[in-house]
Amino acid sequence: MAWTPLLLPLLTFCTVSEASYELTQPPSVSVSPGQTARITCSGDALPKKYAYWYQQKSGQAPVLVIYEDSKRPSGIPERFSGSSSGTMATLTISGAQVEDEADYYCYSTDSSGNH
């Protein structure tokens, strides 16, 4: 699992090794309220696995915002979307809001739940 905090205006870098492969999220980028934030996650296993994205606000449990690459759970605002192509998955927040400030975790698994 890799993570990136969306700090309006900062996204931070992290690389995490999981089950013999790595998921990598990019260096920091600036995001102002109302702008579009794109957080990428790359890994050699992603073409064969689904990407899941979690949002974790300070002091709170993680919340699933995108599953199976691009599906949005009920209750998650439409400004959150996901896509995946080749070895890269992307979480897009269109018109980022102040309340979107959080850590964002990229996680991958196949349909059977294998990491």
From Swiss-Prot:
Subcellular localization: Secreted; Cell membrane
Main location: secreted
The protein's name in its UniProt record: Immunoglobulin lambda variable 3-10
Keyword Cytoplasm: no
Assembly description: Immunoglobulins are composed of two identical heavy chains and two identical light chains; disulfide-linked.
Annotated region described as Framework-1, given as residue ranges: 20-41
Alphabetical UniProt keywords: Adaptive immunity, Cell membrane, Disulfide bond, Immunity, Immunoglobulin, Immunoglobulin domain, Membrane, Secreted, Signal
Biological function: V region of the variable domain of immunoglobulin light chains that participates in the antigen recognition. Immunoglobulins, also known as antibodies, are membrane-bound or secreted glycoproteins produced by B lymphocytes. In the recognition phase of humoral immunity, the membrane-bound immunoglobulins serve as receptors which, upon binding of a specific antigen, trigger the clonal expansion and differentiation of B lymphocytes into immunoglobulins-secreting plasma cells.
Keyword Ubl conjugation: no
Region of interest (Complementarity-determining-2), ranges: 68-70
SUPFAM superfamilies to which the protein is assigned, alphabetical: Immunoglobulin (SSF48726)
Region (Framework-3): 71-106
CC per GO annotation: extracellular region; immunoglobulin complex; plasma membrane
Residue ranges occupied by any Ig-like domain in the UniProt entry: 20-115
Region of interest (Complementarity-determining-3), ranges: 107-115
A Gene Ontology biological process term: immune response
Annotated InterPro entries: Ig-like_dom, Ig-like_dom_sf, Ig-like_fold, Ig_sub, Ig_V-set, IgV_Light_Chain
Source species of the chain: Homo sapiens
Region spans: Framework-2: 51-67
Chain spans, region Complementarity-determining-1: 42-50
Positions of disulphide bridges: C41-C106
Pfam hit, one: V-set
Signal peptide: 1-19
